[in-house]
């Protein structure tokens, strides 16, 4: 099990330090998916990353505003869940949920849940 504290995720080979506090970590057989807590006054939006089990970077989540310009405002993700079928779901403050391809971080679709 991968451990994390503050801005650091502890891999067997080395600790990885991010610019922001780690909010969630989800492990799959191949990847460690990390969601960062972004302060309200910061413009960072793509706050979900995947790393290999040795800590090597794999992907950063695709920009929702570039993929879906109709959403008008891009926010950092506040929650993430990995479903049994290996589907990653992330959601933002506006109640929008996005399906993320776990292999490459691309957004597959979105819906509003509020």
Region spans (language model):
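Secretory-pathway ectodomains
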Residues: 1-114
């Amino acid at each position: 099990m991968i451990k994390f504290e503050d801005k650091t995720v502890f891999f067997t080979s080395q600790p990885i330090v991010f610019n922001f506090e780690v909010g969630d970590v989800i492990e799959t057989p191949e990847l460690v998916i990390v969601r960062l807590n972004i302060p309200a006054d910061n413009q960072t939006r793509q706050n979900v990353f995947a790393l290999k089990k040795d800590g090597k970077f794999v992907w950063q989540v695709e920009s929702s505003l570039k993929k879906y310009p109709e959403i008008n405002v891009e926010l950092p993700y506040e929650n993430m869940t990995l479903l049994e079928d290996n589907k990653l779901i992330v959601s933002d403050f506006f109640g929008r949920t996005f399906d993320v391809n776990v292999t490459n971080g691309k957004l597959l679709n979105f819906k509003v849940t509020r």
